[in-house]
Amino acid sequence: MTTDSASNGNGSAQQPSPSLNILAQYVKDLSFENPGAPRSLQARDRSPAININVNVNANPLAENDFDVVLSLSAQAKDGDKMLFNVELAYGGVFRVAGFPQEHMLPLLFIECPRLLFPFARQIVADATRNGGFPPLMIDPIDFAQMFAQRMAEEKVRAQVANTNDTAN
């Protein structure tokens, strides 16, 4: 005789095992500017200064579905002259189920962007290569450190807001 429900040995139903699924990945916004072309494509004596910015945002879509957007921007300059500017917002729709509530923010702001990053990195590399420059291969990003820094900044903001509220 078989039963259709899983149990943990004491007759009660088990919680479903935690799962993280990617339902979709997409380019939300992509921009590449090469304002000095074709002069910017000429050989130069030194490497350009490259400034890279990274941001992650997450928004709920449904009970267990979330839209996570990894934003990457990079500017290359030779002195004060802009060589290129690339901006990418790369999103993923994730289904997150069976995780304790205290694990949700780390999942959304560390694990989800970690899964999106290789694809976003390739898009940026292709855009810079297609713009006439060597492909920009962004180094791996420590999303755990970014998340910790973000949480620390939000804690400070909350403390300042509480101090301002009690002072009024």
UniProtKB/Swiss-Prot annotation:
<comment type="subunit">
    <text>Homotetramer, a dimer of dimers. One homotetramer interacts with 1 SecA dimer.</text>
</comment>
<comment type="similarity">
    <text>Belongs to the SecB family.</text>
</comment>
<dbReference type="GO" id="GO:0051082">
    <property type="term" value="F:unfolded protein binding"/>
</dbReference>
<dbReference type="GO" id="GO:0006457">
    <property type="term" value="P:protein folding"/>
</dbReference>
<keyword id="KW-0653">Protein transport</keyword>
<keyword id="KW-0813">Transport</keyword>
<keyword id="KW-0811">Translocation</keyword>
<dbReference type="GO" id="GO:0015031">
    <property type="term" value="P:protein transport"/>
</dbReference>
<protein>
    <recommendedName>
        <fullName>Protein-export protein SecB</fullName>
    </recommendedName>
</protein>
<dbReference type="InterPro" id="IPR035958">
    <property type="entry name" value="SecB-like_sf"/>
</dbReference>
<dbReference type="InterPro" id="IPR003708">
    <property type="entry name" value="SecB"/>
</dbReference>
<dbReference type="Pfam" id="PF02556">
    <property type="entry name" value="SecB"/>
</dbReference>
<dbReference type="GO" id="GO:0005737">
    <property type="term" value="C:cytoplasm"/>
</dbReference>
<comment type="function">
    <text>One of the proteins required for the normal export of preproteins out of the cell cytoplasm. It is a molecular chaperone that binds to a subset of precursor proteins, maintaining them in a translocation-competent state. It also specifically binds to its receptor SecA.</text>
</comment>
<dbReference type="GO" id="GO:0051262">
    <property type="term" value="P:protein tetramerization"/>
</dbReference>
<keyword id="KW-0143">Chaperone</keyword>
<keyword id="KW-0963">Cytoplasm</keyword>
